[in-house]
């Protein structure tokens, strides 16, 4: 193990244990730092004190040249800067090659959303009369009905369901718990999945010693993965003409449709689990068709 590899491990442990960052965030930082170490290794750099500002700038340029999105490049730079800052603070390194490197502002893109009609078509389509079909319907209803992140959905345990009170207890980013209200249609889909035996049928495939507390199970009776949720969204989206449907698109659509329906921005911030209301404000965009309609209806010379 090289010195830099050991340093990266210590930093990731710090993020996980002392900073209490979510497993998904730590995993993303791990991937970024592995790419960073591999890039430096090709240059013969194996220790933190040998890293120069030029090395870091070239790594960023390399990531951009590989086609990484601005947000991904900025996250990688944040991981690298955090690593070197940590090493200096801990007395492991005496050089701080990233001190003069500023993180560029990422271009804000409006989130991809589907229309209300498309959402209804997605959720009202006939689902297979199987345990997996009942599960898939519930997955889509909860994603759109509660605005959950995919990691929040897959992390749900049965004890987190408070269906009589009509809310879910969700573990969000930074291990912060919040209450998420649930729609009537999502409640009915969950009831069909849970009370009518679909989950029990999937649970029957699990090994006796490996009974899972998860709400959503795969064909082996274990917790449904993020990748499986992605596949569910793509498959059922495609059947109603929505190509490349992503779980986060349903979260974006939930937020956009809630605001269009008159939801308060602060309330929506709480439901979505955003630490900063500026993150929620991106959903205040209005599509061009609606903008034109409002303009024509309101302007005296239109």
What are these regions (language model features)?
Residues 1-302:
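Conserved catalytic core of the tyrosine transesterase superfamily
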